[in-house]
Amino acid sequence: MKLKITLTKSLIACRVNQIKTAHCLGLKKINNQVIKDDTPAIHGMIKTISHLVVVEKVSDTKEQK
C-alpha cells in the first residue's frame, strides 16, 4: 500500500522541525504531491505535519499503470 501526500497549507509560519519534515517528505510548495510507502517512519512524519497535509491511500495496482 502506498500513501499520496499533498501539502495543502503554507510552511511560512511553521516551526523549523515541521518545515524540515515536509522537506524530507519532498513537499516544498503548496499543492505538491508525493507518493510514499506506507511505513511507520512515514506515519510519524505525517503526524508531525498532519494539520498541513491531506493523505490518501493508493493501491499498488494504480501505480503500475
UniProtKB/Swiss-Prot annotation:
<protein>
    <recommendedName>
        <fullName>Large ribosomal subunit protein uL30</fullName>
    </recommendedName>
</protein>
<keyword id="KW-0689">Ribosomal protein</keyword>
<dbReference type="GO" id="GO:0006412">
    <property type="term" value="P:translation"/>
</dbReference>
<dbReference type="InterPro" id="IPR016082">
    <property type="entry name" value="Ribosomal_uL30_ferredoxin-like"/>
</dbReference>
<comment type="similarity">
    <text>Belongs to the universal ribosomal protein uL30 family.</text>
</comment>
<dbReference type="InterPro" id="IPR036919">
    <property type="entry name" value="Ribo_uL30_ferredoxin-like_sf"/>
</dbReference>
<dbReference type="InterPro" id="IPR005996">
    <property type="entry name" value="Ribosomal_uL30_bac-type"/>
</dbReference>
<comment type="subunit">
    <text>Part of the 50S ribosomal subunit.</text>
</comment>
<dbReference type="GO" id="GO:0003735">
    <property type="term" value="F:structural constituent of ribosome"/>
</dbReference>
<dbReference type="Pfam" id="PF00327">
    <property type="entry name" value="Ribosomal_L30"/>
</dbReference>
<keyword id="KW-0687">Ribonucleoprotein</keyword>
<dbReference type="GO" id="GO:0022625">
    <property type="term" value="C:cytosolic large ribosomal subunit"/>
</dbReference>
